[in-house]
Regions:
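Short C-terminal tail/terminal secondary-structure segment
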Residues: 200-226
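Residue(s) in the substrate-gating loop at a strand-loop-helix junction
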Residues: 113
Length: 226
């Protein structure tokens, strides 16, 4: 998996380990199976080679690494492309590198974002990367049909510190709470299980209903400050 050193990725890794899985995580931060920059082709190749040399096969690939978030006003050409390399190119290339080694019943789960369908100002690099990985999901599902199931998850507001919010922060969510990493980890485990054997090419939004909630200025206490 990618991006397993902290946050959602760390929780996913821990939950797989509880199920007896051997987790090979790559992250820029130290303390994981492989430390390196996902934007570099040679890093991806070295990571894949290490995994295959040591274990010989891959059951699940979880693409979770966080792309850079910068907007049109301050994001450089290099930074924008860096975000795409981490968020889209790396997931594609790892799937390509591991393609000959996926086990029977293997699954890929890509972590996208609810920002793949909605936006805030000055978030272009992140939003485009997340939109890209959502599209990559259904493309890979068709290309790898019959061998590997491929799905994606689009989290909404997930507090990676497991903070329990109250008041407006919680109530604005239709489920009346902010999400936590277990909400995502549980779905990843399900999508990798035989229970999800008839699901591929899908994107599942886990956002407490926020993207389904219509918001208008002056309605239900909402206001837009100009």
């Amino acid at each position: 998996m990618t991006g397993g050193a902290q946050g959602i990725g760390k929780t996913i890794a821990e939950e797989f380990q509880k199920q007896g899985a051997i987790v090979c995580s790559i992250d820029k931060q130290p303390g994981v199976y492989f430390t390196g920059d996902l934007a570099q082709q040679d890093t991806l190749e070295k990571f894949a080679q290490k995994v295959i040399t040591e274990y010989g096969h891959v059951d699940y690939l979880i693409n979770n690494a966080l792309p850079l978030m910068k907007g049109i006003d301050n994001c450089s050409y290099e930074e924008f492309n860096y975000a795409l390399k981490v968020g889209v190119t790396a997931p594609f290339y790892l799937a390509k590198l591991f393609q000959p080694y996926f086990s029977e019943g293997a699954a890929i789960v890509n972590i996208s974002s609810s920002r793949d369908r909605m936006s805030q100002p000055q978030t272009e690099s992140y939003t485009v990367a997340k939109g890209g990985i959502s599209a990559l999901t259904h493309a890979l599902a068709v290309s790898l049909a019959g061998r590997v199931r491929v799905n994606s998850i689009s989290p909404g507001w997930i507090d990676t510190d497991f903070t329990e919010y109250t008041g407006a922060d919680a109530v604005q969510q239709p489920v009346h709470r902010v999400g936590n990493p277990m909400d995502i980890a549980n779905m990843v485990l399900f999508l990798c299980s035989e229970k999800a054997g008839f699901i591929t090419g899908e994107n599942i939004c886990i956002d407490g209903g926020m993207t389904k909630q219509m918001i208008y200025h002056g309605d239900c206490g909402w206001r837009f400050d100009i």
